[in-house]
């Protein structure tokens, strides 16, 4: 990183600003081949394998977060040999500390705009509000070398194709509103304020306007949730590999030390109201039990279940 110091002096006083920047070349290489179209990160002319995770808010009460909290989590990502984090569109635009640390640690950031898993209006008032927010965030973050890609939303195009939305909502209205927001307003802001960075309309997707084809393993990026949501064996991960797997996973209980912070040991069981209230997945604890039963001997108690 290079440190730049700037000063502006007038008869009324002096303002100083110090910024750090990094110099690098980045592109998303989308080369056509026999499977479809690739989706490869290329840094300084060298294709890389992107290993990483989706980043969600690190605390339910984000104002409690300090720089050292980000430092601990991001250091853990680096120690796990991760080089890429996707700031998920159902969370928040992160603090300056987060991006500063990613710059320092060499972590690439896929930055979603904060739209996820829902329908959004396309009226002028809403679009103007979105444009103001997008302009603020792009202008705030564009000097961070860690950010390599802007993405319009999380799973909204996918939802159209796979969540039954086609049968619930009028296609013409939905399509028009969607395309105005994610194929006109947001890319226009990026092109004006940050033209060197790549813009991708929706994750997962093929980059097309709606209706498009949805996600496919031959092109674009993919989310795969047949393991966990679909109940498939872990081996399904090996059989469902796309060009860029930007989201997949398996739920895990937190460390016992964390559980002890909010639940007395006498109430630590899968049916207790406290444990249930902390389980936010629609499939609940039963799905965790299912996968534990598939791979491990029956746990003796709750604590052995978590461990």
Task: Please give the residue ranges for each predicted region.
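Active-site neighborhood of glycoside hydrolase catalytic domains
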Residues: 104, 120-213
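Aromatic-lined substrate-binding rim segments of carbohydrate-active enzymes
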Residues: 75-80, 84-130, 136, 212-235
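Substrate-binding clefts and catalytic carboxylate motifs of secreted carbohydrate-active enzymes
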Residues: 150, 181, 188-191, 197-307
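Secreted/periplasmic carbohydrate-active enzymes, especially glycoside hydrolases
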Residues: 1-85, 104, 216, 230, ...
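The substrate-binding groove and active-site-proximal loops of carbohydrate-active enzymes
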Residues: 54-67, 80-91, 113-129, 156, ...
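Hydrophobic faces of well-ordered beta-strands that scaffold small-molecule active sites
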Residues: 51-53, 85-87, 109-111, 152, ...
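Alpha-helical scaffolding within the catalytic cores
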Residues: 30-39, 95-97, 132-140
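Aromatic- and acidic-residue-enriched carbohydrate-binding clefts of CAZyme catalytic domains
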Residues: 46-55, 108-121, 137, 149-176, ...
